[in-house]
Amino acid sequence: MALRVLFFATGLLTSSSLAAAPDLTGIWTLNGPGTESEILLTEEGLRIQSEYDLLVDDPSLFCVPASASRIWANPGARILIQQSEEAVLISYELFDLRRDIPIGDESAMTDMPSTKNIDGTYFQEMGSSFAGYVDERLIIESRNHSLGYIRTSRGIPQSRNTVTNEVLRIEGDTLHLTHTYFDDTLYENPIVMDYFFRRTDESEITLYECREANYDWFNELNAPKEEETQ
């Protein structure tokens, strides 16, 4: 729980902490697959995973973000970060998501999800968040998640008990994100994921305009050939 202890030990994080703020403003894209710690699920986590069917239950099929981790880790999708004294706005090209995170302590967090799409639909899968700056890092804490999946390919779940920390820092020309998931009901140990992003020269992100999809292409690809059935 080191990241959570670090966050709360800083006390009230107000706009005055901007003096310690890294310059995250700009458009970023994922640079490589990233890394993750060993994932050990509890009995409840394994139960949820065993009932997950990628071809049916993947929220992306319905233009719904499965989790913040899933959105950060989407290859090729641009991410716009904007900073002000009161908030950090993260605009994800994927699903046209807009994540408005207040700067402050826990009292700055509302019961509403911090993320909605450009049509005004809110997504509890992304949680409710608040943030602050510590030692040239942006630290985001999120709670109040709904059921979702931090790894849709493997059905690694999150729940309403899940708490997450996102620590963003600049290293040279690279944005480094350490994303940690805490949930004693699902994980034997916190799950830690590291991602790296490169800053682009682009000035805006394009509309994604998601439409509901399916995995028919996958089923067709893996269907037995006619000669194999004869």
Residue ranges and their predicted role:
Residues 19-230:
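Hydrophobic small-molecule pocket/channel-lining residues, especially in calycin-type beta-barrels
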Residues 2-9:
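Sec-dependent signal peptide recognition
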Residues 14-17:
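N-terminal signal peptide c-region/cleavage motif recognized by signal peptidases
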